[in-house]
């Protein structure tokens, strides 16, 4: 879920802390990617088309296709991605996880109803909401990335917190996730939409933590309190206090303790259980592996060609010719000379307006039904494929 309304609050109140750019301008950058978030995007990408990719056992492989295509594109742009996988969530998150299960159950019931009524539009909508990342899918993603020569970090706790630790430790330039709580974990740079398909024509939205704090006119501790008041995964928020009011009240009262004293008896309603002190501690002292212990993990190596063929073609029924094409592109990307970075590409923005992108790739000649599905997946994960 992240932090409710935080991105818009920052765009409204600290617009100079947000910049837009295109993926290709991240050449030479190392980025830590929230793997679960990225793979979830890939899983639902084909839900809109009703063209789920599956293996011989009928298991969906959309996430592997998306991971292969998008990671290859990043490598071709000279970006070095590191994928960070979630570990055990904090106990305080159990309530939010239970709510997600309930929403998934409702979505499954609504999907079945839409199926009975033959309402295809609602079927697609509810089908997307039933999607959850399984442990098997997560393990398959790790296996694919390692075979591609891309580093994988398994966080002891929340992936966003581990990404932030890698960024604070100087091992990567940015945390790439859609969850705004990466900023609450004090990642120096947050890059949203980095794993989106270029076909979506949505620019990368980059937040700089130091400028966010300065723009909002608060301390780091106050920023954490604002995020808690906005609403996060670890506790319910106070009814009647949204993002802008949270900012104003923390500026006025200094912290949640003083705020609670001053709203007592008024129309604001705090949750019966409001463990804000524990939530604060989660954000300030998250369960992470120190970046100093992960230096040797952050290595990008040659792809395991035969391993990829065995896994993707023989186990997952990917088209061999297309897989070998990806392998060739990955190898070619490693042979490119290092370019000098020019950091003047970024332009500050006040809203998430789109920028022009390249036109989508032309359709290839029709082959088998399976191959057509693979092409559809490519179109949803990359706007242009190198021949």
Swiss-Prot record:
Enzyme class: hydrolase
Cofactor: binding comment: Binds 2 magnesium ions per subunit. They probably participate in the reaction catalyzed by the enzyme. May bind an additional third magnesium ion after substrate binding.
Residues binding DNA: 70, 158, 231, 233
Main location: nucleus
Gene Ontology BP terms: base-excision repair; DNA replication, removal of RNA primer
Cell compartment(s), UniProt: Nucleus, Nucleolus; Nucleus, Nucleoplasm; Mitochondrion
Enzyme Commission number: 3.1.-.-
Keywords, in A-Z order: DNA damage, DNA repair, DNA replication, Endonuclease, Exonuclease, Hydrolase, Magnesium, Metal-binding, Mitochondrion, Nuclease, Nucleus, Phosphoprotein
GO cellular component, one term: nucleoplasm
Region (N-domain): 1-104
Residue span of region I-domain: 122-253
Binding-site residues, Mg(2+) 2: 179, 181, 233
Renumbered residue ranges of the record's region Interaction with PCNA: 338-346
Compositional bias annotation for Low complexity: 378-387
Binding-site residues, Mg(2+) 1: 34, 86, 158, 160
InterPro entries xrefs: 5-3_exonuclease, 5-3_exonuclease_C_sf, Flap_endonuc, HhH2, PIN-like_dom_sf, XPG-I_dom, XPG/Rad2, XPG_CS
Record-linked PROSITE patterns: XPG_1, XPG_2
Family of the protein in this entry: Belongs to the XPG/RAD2 endonuclease family. FEN1 subfamily.
Subunit structure comment from the entry: Interacts with PCNA. Three molecules of FEN1 bind to one PCNA trimer with each molecule binding to one PCNA monomer. PCNA stimulates the nuclease activity without altering cleavage specificity.
Function text: Structure-specific nuclease with 5'-flap endonuclease and 5'-3' exonuclease activities involved in DNA replication and repair. During DNA replication, cleaves the 5'-overhanging flap structure that is generated by displacement synthesis when DNA polymerase encounters the 5'-end of a downstream Okazaki fragment. It enters the flap from the 5'-end and then tracks to cleave the flap base, leaving a nick for ligation. Also involved in the long patch base excision repair (LP-BER) pathway, by cleaving within the apurinic/apyrimidinic (AP) site-terminated flap.
Descriptive protein name: Flap endonuclease 1
Organism: Naegleria gruberi (Amoeba)
Name of the encoding gene: FEN1
């Amino acid at each position: 879920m992240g932090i409710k309304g935080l991105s818009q609050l920052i765009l409204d109140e600290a617009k100079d802390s947000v910049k837009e750019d295109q993926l290709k301008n991240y050449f030479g950058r190392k980025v830590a990617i929230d793997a679960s978030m990225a793979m979830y995007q890939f899983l639902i990408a084909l839900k809109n088309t009703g063209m789920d990719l599956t293996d011989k056992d009928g298991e969906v492989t959309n996430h592997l296709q998306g991971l292969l295509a998008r990671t290859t594109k990043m490598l071709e742009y000279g970006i070095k991605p590191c994928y960070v996988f979630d570990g055990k969530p904090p106990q305080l998150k159990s309530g939010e996880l239970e709510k997600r299960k309930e929403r998934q159950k409702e979505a499954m019931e609504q999907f079945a109803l839409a199926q009975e009524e033959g309402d295809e539009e609602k079927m697609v909508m509810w089908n997307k909401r039933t999607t959850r990342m399984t442990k098997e899918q997560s393990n398959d993603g790790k296996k694919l990335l390692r075979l591609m020569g891309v580093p994988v970090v398994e966080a002891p706790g929340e992936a966003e917190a581990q990404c932030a630790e890698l960024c604070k430790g100087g091992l990567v330039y940015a945390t790439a996730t859609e969850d705004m709580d990466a900023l609450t974990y004090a990642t120096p740079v947050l890059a949203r939409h980095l794993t989106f398909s270029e076909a979506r024509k949505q620019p990368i939205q980059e937040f700089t933590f130091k400028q966010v704090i300065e723009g909002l006119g608060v301390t780091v501790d106050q920023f954490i309190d604002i995020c808690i008041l906005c609403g996060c995964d670890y506790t319910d928020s106070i009814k009647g206090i949204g993002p802008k009011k949270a900012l104003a009240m923390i500026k006025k009262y200094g912290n949640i303790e003083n705020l609670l004293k001053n709203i007592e008896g008024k129309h604001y309603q705090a949750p019966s259980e409001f463990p804000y002190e524990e939530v604060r501690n989660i954000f300030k002292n998250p369960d992470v592996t120190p970046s100093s212990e992960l230096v040797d993990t952050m290595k990008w190596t040659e792809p395991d060609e035969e391993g990829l063929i065995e896994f993707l073609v023989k186990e997952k029924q990917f088209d061999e010719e297309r897989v070998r094409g990806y392998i060739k592109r990955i190898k070619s990307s490693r042979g490119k000379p290092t370019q000098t970075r020019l950091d003047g590409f970024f332009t500050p923005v006040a809203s998430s307006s789109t920028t022009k992108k390249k036109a989508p790739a032309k359709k290839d000649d029709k082959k088998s039904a399976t191959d057509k599905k693979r092409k559809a997946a490519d179109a949803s994960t990359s706007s242009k494929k190198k021949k």
